[in-house]
Amino acid sequence: MGANHVLNPREVDPVQQILAITDGLGVDVVLEMSGNAQAMRQGFKALRNGGRVSLLGIPSRVIELDLANDIIFKGATIFGISGRLIFDTWYRTRRILEAGQLDLKQVITHTLPFDQLHEAMEIMKTGDCGKIVMTM
């Protein structure tokens, strides 16, 4: 996958680290998949001018963002997800999972400690795996 840097937000301020790594410019693209309010705010703060944010996670509540500084003045482009059946699909999937009709444990083919991230990436490259879970 070619990751040059991996940051654990429990140990460091990811925005400060990203800005330090990019000489204060920020990242070109943010892919926010958790829906976590803090992660979304950090993503916008770490974005470079003219950068792109793809919001793929669904927040559980309203999120306050600094629209002027983090979006408007940066000229950020924001993408969401859409599709007429997206919510219907999610709700159906949730019902199936909650009812125990589908055992997703079979999808998990590997569980590795986080310090074996490189090995996990190599396994993924082979295509000979399902879901790889990294533990900390």
What is each of the regions a protein language model found here?
Residues 36-99, 136:
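Glycine-rich phosphate-binding loop and adjacent beta-alpha segment
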Residues 41-45, 87-136:
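C-terminal hydrophobic helical "lid"/dimerization subdomain
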Residues 4-5, 77, 103:
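Conserved beta-strand segments of alpha/beta enzyme cores
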Residues 6, 18, 30, 47, ...:
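Hydrophobic packing within well-folded, soluble alpha/beta domains
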Residues 7, 28-33, 56-57, 81-82, ...:
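Glycine- and other small-residue-rich loops at beta-strand/loop junctions that grip anionic moieties
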Residues 1-42:
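Adenosine-nucleotide cofactor-binding segment
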Residues 12-14, 63, 113:
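Short acidic loop-to-helix transition motifs that present clustered carboxylates
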